[in-house]
């Protein structure tokens, strides 16, 4: 009799615990909605590298996840930061404080990303960076609330810088965009070149609003450097490559290195102009069957092939939603812990992982742009030169200045 009573009590307790657990899970999503904000450049010089493509990639991830997580709807909001840090900060603050956005995505433009990731820490929300590239985001400016996902200036430098320096291209001149990412890209690439016995013979910086780079290219040409490195991105990089072609930089024997080249940049340039460019990328649409399958879906919506920012926006959003599901809540620190715990295996990365500094570690790829005669069709732009394993592509934790990294 006593045993029967105890059994009945245990069953009742289990039922109550189950009800309480279900209730807890049902209430685990703040405001009964998971809200994701894409804060990006919708109309400016980086809009082709972010903009509507980033929005589409995040929307695809939400749809593929089923539109709900833990039984609650996933909502998408979008804003154009216009490449102005004050506007971006105002939007991010309103999103976090008033509109209760849980995660802000993309964040192209390093100055903006550095500001918003610090705000995410302050507000205990999450920021996932795919557009911006400054390696400071996971170095001295790391936060426990942010992830730097697809690439950074260190990995780009490690790829393109080492590939050319090892091939005997030891003297470099930098044509650098005068903003946070350009500075980081020049610094990281210079360090790689010097470590391999090379030298930087000169550099010049130009405002990112500059579209005529003739005077800067004349300096590069006069330097007689073996490599003219373009440390910038977007329309300014496209214009620089076109101008370099007009000035005969490569015809004069100098190598032109694009330190951040998006596949959409190559499309804008055309193979006749872009051929021979050496670049480092995290994603290429034609890499394998998985990348081709996802890229085909993206192309059907955007009428252009995706680049690493688009692919990273999709992959990181899916990973974020999976982490919410695994954590049973959208509370930022619980979700961040799951994001660091769960491996990333999809079309973007194999055995990817997020370190304590917020860096997502995955393989990087060094490509060379094909000559027109080598291309088999539209968007067939790259030939693979080298695969850089993730543990070699990104800054080692032993060299990190991130205060979250435990050493010794």
Regions from the language model: what does each represent?
Residues 1-34, 404-408:
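Short, low-complexity disordered leader/linker segments with a strong preference
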Residues 23-38, 67-75, 165-170:
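Immediate post-signal peptide segment of exported/extracytoplasmic ligand-binding proteins
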Residues 28-59, 79-86, 108-109, 175-183, ...:
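Extracytoplasmic "Venus flytrap"
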Residues 33, 48-54, 64, 68-137, ...:
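Beta-alpha junction/loop-to-helix N-cap segments that form part of ligand/metal-binding clefts
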Residues 34, 343, 347-408:
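Solvent-exposed, acidic/polar segments of extracytosolic/periplasmic ligand-binding ectodomains
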Residues 90, 135-136, 143-247, 283-293, ...:
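Extracellular/periplasmic Venus flytrap/periplasmic-binding protein
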Residues 95, 99-108, 128-130, 171-176, ...:
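Periplasmic-binding protein-like
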Residues 241-316, 325-330, 373, 380-407:
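Extracellular/periplasmic periplasmic-binding protein-like sensory domains
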């Amino acid at each position: 009799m006593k045993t029967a009573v105890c059994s009945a009590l245990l069953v009742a307790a289990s039922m109550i615990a189950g009800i309480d657990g279900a209730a807890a899970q049902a209430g685990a999503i703040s405001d009964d909605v998971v809200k994701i904000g894409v804060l990006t450049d919708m109309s400016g010089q980086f809009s082709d590298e972010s903009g509507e493509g980033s929005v589409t990639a995040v929307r695809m991830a939400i749809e593929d996840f089923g539109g709900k997580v833990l039984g609650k709807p996933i909502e998408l909001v979008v804003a154009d930061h216009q490449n102005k840090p004050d506007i971006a900060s105002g939007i991010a603050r309103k999103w976090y404080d008033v509109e209760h956005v849980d995660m802000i995505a993309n964040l192209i433009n390093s100055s903006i990303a550095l500001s918003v990731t610090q705000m995410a820490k302050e507000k205990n929300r999450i920021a996932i960076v795919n557009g911006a590239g400054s390696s400071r985001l996971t170095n001295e400016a790391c936060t426990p609330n942010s992830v730097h996902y697809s690439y950074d200036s260190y990995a780009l430098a490690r790829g393109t810088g080492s590939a050319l320096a090892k091939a005997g291209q030891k003297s470099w001149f930098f044509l650098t965009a005068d903003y946070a990412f350009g500075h980081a890209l020049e610094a990281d690439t210079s360090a790689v070149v010097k470590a391999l016995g090379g030298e930087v013979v000169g550099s010049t910086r130009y405002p990112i609003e500059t579209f005529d780079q003739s005077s800067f290219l004349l300096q590069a040409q006069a330097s007689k450097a073996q490599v003219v490195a373009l440390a910038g991105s977007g329309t300014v990089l496209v214009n620089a490559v076109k101008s370099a072609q007009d000035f005969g930089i490569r015809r004069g024997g100098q190598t032109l290195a694009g330190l951040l080249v998006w596949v959409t940049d190559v499309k804008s340039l055309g193979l006749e102009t872009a051929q021979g460019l050496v670049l480092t990328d995290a994603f290429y649409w034609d890499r394998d069957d998985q990348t081709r399958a996802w890229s085909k879906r993206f192309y059907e919506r955007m009428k252009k092939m995706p680049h690493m920012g688009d692919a990273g926006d999709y992959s990181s959003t899916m990973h974020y939603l999976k982490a919410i599901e695994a954590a049973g809540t959208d509370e930022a620190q619980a979700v961040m812990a799951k994001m660091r715990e769960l491996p990333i295996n999809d079309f973007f990365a194999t055995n990817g992982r997020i370190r304590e500094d917020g860096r997502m570690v995955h393989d990087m790829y060094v490509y060379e742009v094909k000559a027109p005669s080598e291309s088999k069709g539209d968007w067939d732009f790259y030939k693979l030169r080298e695969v850089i394993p993730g543990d070699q592509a990104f800054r080692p934790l032993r060299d990190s200045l991130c205060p979250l990294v435990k050493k010794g």
